[in-house]
Design a protein with these regions (language model features):
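Sec-type signal peptide cleavage vicinity
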Residues: 2-6, 15-342
């Protein structure tokens, strides 16, 4: 691969005269400009966008590298023809000779064009996971493929590098069978690690070796559909497992507490490209006692799809509850019913 960025201006002049840009000579070598299209590998979606669905937004920008010299070239998505074009025409990627070249791409792009960015330091916080716009910066996407001068039209199939967790609260009933009205819910996910890295060259996101076990907090309301959503670094869950803790103040000013303990045997890890979705049914037992959240069924689908149904017995606070993790690759949906603490 030759570094031909400095010759792109000449190519542009040649294009004016020849009317097409797939047979231009650079210092005696024929070159072909690479064209890019892209898709996001995800099976299921509710909110269709570059980070949660299967389409790109017009104007989205990615980084593409080809071979040993054309590194970190920024391309912008054009919705009209489902293609990416170089932001800087002088830096667009061309292929010379008959070799096969490795092509990699990642989103969102960082650093400067022409230089390989360092491994990115990642810190997940309650603040940077609070809204879809803030979370978008942490849903890293990565693609890799091959390209030749004979086959310069390259399709990039992006995969999610992170794990995703969705905790959706739905209204249950009170002791008389009346529906519960959901108000603001304060929700915590406890037992996760929040610090690590994303390697733009390999597409691997990982927790740091010394990352501490921590928690994340979100306030849930009608604006976010009472759904706690975070992007997390793929990781092995610690021996203590995970806990979901929540509290809601009722219309008559009572405070209802919810709790779910997920043992590590049921959810041992979070995998890249997997979304783990839990549906939590918020009942009101008309008491001040904390309420244990219990699982009544599961539905697993990667950002591959596996379905599961369970009807566990009611358990007291601190006892096990089934909540099997699986494959965004695979999403996991858990239906959970709270029972009054004994």
């Amino acid at each position: 691969m030759k570094n031909i960025s400095s010759m792109a201006a000449l190519a542009a002049l040649l294009l004016v005269s020849c009317g097409q840009d797939t047979d231009v000579k650079f210092a005696g070598d024929e070159g072909a400009k690479v064209t890019f299209s892209a898709s996001i590998n995800e099976q299921n979606s509710q909110d269709v966008s570059r980070v949660t669905g299967v389409t790109w937004d017009d104007g989205d920008e990615v980084s593409i590298s080809c071979g040993p010299t054309q590194k970190n070239v920024f391309y912008r998505y054009n919705a009209a023809d489902n293609s990416f074009t170089a932001i800087n025409r002088l830096d667009e990627i061309w292929l010379l000779g008959n070799e096969e070249y490795d092509v990699t791409a990642y989103y969102p792009h960082v650093g400067e064009e022409g230089t390989v960015p360092p491994v990115q330091i990642v810190e997940i916080t309650s603040e940077n996971q609070d809204t879809p716009e803030e979370r978008a910066a942490f849903d890293f996407l990565y693609a890799s493929t091959k390209a030749t001068k004979a086959e310069p039209n390259v399709h990039l199939n992006f995969n999610h590098a992170m794990s995703r967790v969705n905790l959706k609260f739905v209204p249950g009933t009170d002791p008389e069978g009346n529906p519960v009205t959901l108000t603001d819910i304060e929700c915590y996910l406890v037992g996760i690690k929040r610090n690590g890295t994303f390697d733009t060259e390999t597409g691997v996101a990982a927790v740091a070796e010394d990352a501490a076990v921590s928690d994340l907090r979100q306030m849930l309301n009608a604006d976010n559909d009472h759904t706690f959503t975070v992007y997390l670094l793929p990781q092995t869950i610690g021996a203590e497992g995970l806990q979901i803790e929540a509290a809601m103040t009722t219309a008559d000013s009572r405070r209802i507490y919810y709790f779910l303990e997920i043992p590590v045997s049921d959810w041992p890890e979070m995998k890249a490209g997997y979304s783990y979705n839990y549906t939590l049914t918020a009942n009101d037992y008309m008491t001040a006692s904390p309420t244990v959240l219990e699982i009544s069924g599961t539905d697993i689908n990667p950002w591959t799809e596996v379905n599961k149904e369970e009807t566990p017995d009611a358990k007291a606070l601190g006892t096990e509850a089934k909540a099997e993790g699986s494959e965004w690759g695979e999403m996991e949906t858990e239906e959970i019913i709270p029972v009054e603490k004994q």
